[in-house]
Amino acid sequence: VHAVDGIDITLRENETLALVGESGSGKTTAGKAILRLLGKEAKISGSIRICGEDTASPKGKNLKALRQAAQIIFQDPFSSLDPRMTVGETLLEALESLRPDMSREEKSERIRGLLSRVGLREDALRRYPHEFSGGQRQRIAIARALAPEPKLIICDEPTSALDVSVQAQILNLLGRIQRETGIAYLLITHNFGVVEYIADRVAVMRSGKIVEEGPLEDVLQHPASTYTRELLDAVPRLGGI
């Protein structure tokens, strides 16, 4: 069984590609395949290149290099953070694992800078995830993803578990971070309102295959695929943004 078949996508620096489709279309599987998060039983063929490096079969140091180059923000900020670790410990763990080249002082400075970048105060370092709101937890998850200075972040439904007003704040934060760093986003979502707000290009998935891809305006205003037109008519929109 091929959960994802024949995927061919290119992401440039400072670009957001939205991967959209209904539940079961394969979009989350595609995102996890890039980061080698599917488990040993998953069979992946082809190439996955990040900054020219083929990461299709990473092991050992290569896997660590992949994790440094590409990170993920999960859908649920309530389960993606270890409840036993403070925010400071969570961010330090990411740096110790993926940036052993940094000194202790550099890591401390990096952690403080990450909190500032995502709009949290320094006293958050000593607090635990349950002490934060959903939006604040997602900011912590974003800071963790940014910790090793990746070139790519996969955003897997990063706002769907949040209130609409908070969704806008998180999307604005992601946009500002991209403008400041040039990072690329692969945005996995079913919400075309989110797509309209942040994406540069759109790829539409159905049954594990991409059925349409193009610039945002072309796909939304002049969809070539009947399936894309059906999605545009059926999926929820993000109000209030």
What does each model-identified segment do?
Residues 1-239:
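ABC transporter nucleotide-binding domains
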